[in-house]
From Swiss-Prot:
<feature type="topological domain" description="Periplasmic">
    <location>
        <begin position="229"/>
        <end position="262"/>
    </location>
</feature>
<feature type="transmembrane region" description="Helical">
    <location>
        <begin position="263"/>
        <end position="283"/>
    </location>
</feature>
<feature type="topological domain" description="Periplasmic">
    <location>
        <begin position="33"/>
        <end position="80"/>
    </location>
</feature>
<protein>
    <recommendedName>
        <fullName>sn-glycerol-3-phosphate transport system permease protein UgpA</fullName>
    </recommendedName>
</protein>
<feature type="transmembrane region" description="Helical">
    <location>
        <begin position="208"/>
        <end position="228"/>
    </location>
</feature>
<keyword id="KW-1003">Cell membrane</keyword>
<keyword id="KW-0813">Transport</keyword>
<dbReference type="GO" id="GO:0005886">
    <property type="term" value="C:plasma membrane"/>
</dbReference>
<dbReference type="Pfam" id="PF00528">
    <property type="entry name" value="BPD_transp_1"/>
</dbReference>
<feature type="topological domain" description="Periplasmic">
    <location>
        <begin position="131"/>
        <end position="157"/>
    </location>
</feature>
<feature type="topological domain" description="Cytoplasmic">
    <location>
        <begin position="102"/>
        <end position="109"/>
    </location>
</feature>
<dbReference type="InterPro" id="IPR035906">
    <property type="entry name" value="MetI-like_sf"/>
</dbReference>
<feature type="transmembrane region" description="Helical">
    <location>
        <begin position="12"/>
        <end position="32"/>
    </location>
</feature>
<keyword id="KW-0472">Membrane</keyword>
<keyword id="KW-1133">Transmembrane helix</keyword>
<dbReference type="GO" id="GO:0055085">
    <property type="term" value="P:transmembrane transport"/>
</dbReference>
<dbReference type="InterPro" id="IPR050809">
    <property type="entry name" value="UgpAE/MalFG_permease"/>
</dbReference>
């Protein structure tokens, strides 16, 4: 006879317990999302005092704007680089710490420190290092015959914001990867080694499948981070330049809505960005998750 499941003495208590979370979701997500959807089909004056229904006109104008399409492409490239490089570097560092016995605590502490730095501060730190006139890295590159000026070179500007964004997120990824690696039974790794599997083969055939749930979770988190949370890095490092080379969708929304006071266009861009992130998340859960092995 199976034991009975513990229940609540009052039928309304479960609903009361989830009410705060539902209220937060409604106030900070559903309400703003609903307003953005409504404003996206309106044309508003700069102060939002008068409006006129225009249907899909705002969306049509966006997809006819070459600068918006360029920011769309920039966002995809930027997000892929931040998520891909961040996950690979973090996994490599976690694997190194996991196999190092001496000084592993020191390595963990040093690798966790960047997570305590605000994104804007992280961008400023890298700006000082890559400053065309005073930066230490810039002077080192100059001695090698390479000229650096991210304010004029779009490729260098993209490299700078990707580097700062990846550096800021490495600590978060590192903690999860290290915990996942340390949870793998050593007996499995030792058995694979006895069977003749080398370090590389053990990693790809044994370790990587076992940590795939964590890898999948971090893939989703890093893509969302690249889409939204890198705004302070871009704003502080390049301001979206040069020539909008580092203007992502989230930064263009800010520029249109807060700097240009084009509320209708920024609302339409917000809706498109929301649908894009939802679509990418659905694709990941439908196709990528199939290769994830849950224990």
């Amino acid at each position: 006879m199976s034991p009975s499941r513990p229940g609540f003495s009052c039928s309304w208590l479960p609903y009361l317990l989830v009410l705060p979370q539902l209220a937060i979701t409604a106030i900070f997500f559903l309400w703003p999302a609903g307003e953005a959807l409504w404003y996206s089909v309106q044309t508003l004056d700069p102060f939002g005092l008068s409006s006129e229904f225009v249907g899909l006109s705002n969306f049509i104008q966006l997809f006819q704007d070459e600068y918006y399409l360029a920011s769309f492409y920039t966002t995809l490239i930027f997000s892929a680089l931040v998520a891909g490089i961040g996950l690979i570097v973090s996994l490599f560092l976690a694997a190194m710490v996991n196999y190092v016995l001496r000084g592993s605590r020191l390595y963990q502490t040093l690798l966790i420190l960047p997570y305590a730095v605000a994104p804007a501060v992280a961008a400023v730190l890298w700006i000082f290092l890559f400053d065309p006139g005073l930066g230490l890295i810039t002077h080192a590159l100059a001695k090698l015959g390479y000229s650096w000026n991210h304010a004029q070179n779009s490729g260098q500007a993209m490299f700078l914001v990707v580097l700062a964004s990846v550096w800021k997120q490495i600590s978060y990824n590192f903690l999860f990867f290290l915990a996942a690696l340390q949870s793998i039974p050593k007996s499995l790794v030792e058995a694979a080694a006895i069977d003749g599997a080398g370090p590389v083969r053990r990693f790809f055939n044994l370790v990587l499948p076992l940590i795939s749930p964590v890898s999948f979770f971090l893939l989703v988190v890093n893509l969302v981070y690249a889409f939204f949370d890198t705004f302070p890095v871009i704003d502080a490092a390049t301001g979206g330049g040069p020539v909008q080379a580092t203007t992502t969708l989230i930064y263009k929304i800010y520029r249109e809505g807060f700097a240009g006071l084009d509320l209708s266009s920024s609302a339409a861009q917000s809706v498109i960005l929301m649908l894009l992130v939802i679509g990418l998340t659905v694709i990941q859960f439908r196709f990528v998750e199939r290769k994830v092995r849950y224990q």
